[in-house]
A protein has these predicted regions:
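Long, amphipathic alpha-helical coiled-coil segments characteristic
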Residues: 11-61, 91-116
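Short, well-ordered alpha-helical segments
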Residues: 39, 51, 55-58, 66-86
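Intrinsically disordered or compositionally simple regulatory linkers and C-terminal tails
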Residues: 1-5
Length: 117
């Protein structure tokens, strides 16, 4: 799978990312590093531990990473979760927003694994 096909599979637009980062090699490097990133697992751990501050921080960090890498569907889902958690109150119903992040994360990782080899 090509890098452009990877972005298409995840529902993202490759061209702006390539333009912003400057080369396919750099985009590939950072996309593959995303597979090792612990932000999503940190989000899951924080929610399991009922740590609202850390959950917000992890959701916000994930949103930023996805913005930089052009992983738009996951960025949008993590942005919605970030807003749900902004008040640092886990009594709000964030389950649907978290499920959307989880689904988009799995789709994104699956697409990236297609270029990993």
């Amino acid at each position: 799978m090509t890098l452009q096909e990877c972005y298409t599979k995840m529902g993202a637009d490759y061209a702006p990312v390539l333009q912003r980062l400057g080369s396919e090699r750099i985009v590939t490097k950072f996309a593959l590093r995303f597979l090792e990133d612990k932000t999503f697992s940190g989000l899951c751990d924080a929610l399991d531990a009922h740590d609202a501050e850390e959950a917000f921080r992890m959701a916000h960090t994930l949103k930023g990473i996805c913005l930089n890498l052009g992983f738009e569907p996951l960025r949008q889902a993590s942005s919605e979760l970030t807003e749900e958690l902004r008040g640092r109150d886990l009594s709000v119903d964030y389950a649907d927003a978290f499920q959307a992040v989880k689904t988009r994360y799995q789709q994104t990782v699956s697409a990236i694994r297609g270029i990993a080899g």
